[in-house]
Amino acid sequence: MRIYKQTNKQIDMKNKLLAIIASTGLVASASAVKVNDNLSINGFIDGSYQHVDNSLLSAAGDSTPAGSPESTTDQSLGLDEVELNFIYNHGPVSGTISLDGYDSFNTGNGLANPGDRVEVEQAHITYSLDNGVSFTLGKYGSALGFEREDPQGLYTFSRAYGGSSANSFNLGHIDVNVVEGLTVAYSADAYSIAASFENNEDVDGEEDELNLEISFAYTGIDNVNLGGGYFFDNQGNSELETDVLNLHASTSFGKLFLAAEYIELSRGNSVGDGSDLDGYMVLADYDINNKLGVALRVSSNEMDANADYEKVTIAPNYAITENLGAIVEFSDVENNNNDGNEMAIELTYTF
């Protein structure tokens, strides 16, 4: 069992969901180094070995020497991501700055400009009132999606959705879905709601109207967590808009944790082939003992009206120490009728 991926999720799921919704992207971690009464630092180092056997690789044709048999296998070994988070709290004011470095060639994270990069992943300040209302301003990720940002937000190594529409379905993947905006949130004992007025990073707000994301979380039923919301895409040309509906639920029975998610993309006529797309995920995670656990995930997402991406993943995980965890993942993938197998070994150190 990965301490920071499973035990914290099962014991503190309610608090985490409320915090995520209310603050829209606060960094989660198993521990933090306290610098003084107001400032703490946490982060992680994540690396992996990956092996892919997929007939789609031979279709690329750019990595196989002329005259050689087309290769359908690929492998990589390296440092995936390093993150350092500075968290400030003083009375009603809190703030987070997340510095992120990653190798997007090794992680395959869908970035437009792949390669080694170091950047400010998140930077936001929050002002909280005594009545449960809070205001967050800055750069942050979406509050939608069951799977969250960074290794701590996943029960597996890989993300559920893939193919050409992966970035649209992996809502919580902050490396590809980050915005700049203002969130107004309200948090009560059993529920929270939030409205984020936002634009994509580095987009001029004068070019189109602000996008709007409405999110919610409900924890009023014992051992049950409900969440989701709706993203309203407001562009200058409505034919280019993609609205997003997200619903997810989770529950636990002793050592067994279950979750399910549904996502629907309503696309304008000029987006792809103009068809609406949907995807789903079902996850089961079982703690065998205090150190060993296993996750099973089944997921599917449409890439266009005639092509689907389907994935079955099994991921045993082991807590080597309180701060060092390992995952061995095996996935069977069908990408538009092309079959493939993926294997990964991941090590993550948190501090």
Predicted segment positions?
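Outer membrane beta-barrel
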Residues: 33-57, 66-200, 208-210, 217-223, ...
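Outer-membrane beta-barrel "beta-signal"
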Residues: 318-320, 339-351
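Outer-membrane beta-barrel architecture
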Residues: 83-85, 123-126, 183-185, 215-217, ...
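Transmembrane beta-strands of outer-membrane beta-barrel proteins
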Residues: 41-45, 95-97, 135, 193-195, ...
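Detector for outer-membrane/organellar transmembrane beta-barrel domains
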Residues: 188-192, 207-209, 214-305
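Outer-membrane beta-barrel pore domains and translocons
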Residues: 46-50, 100-102, 140-142, 196-200, ...
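Gram-negative bacterial Sec-dependent N-terminal signal peptides
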Residues: 2-33
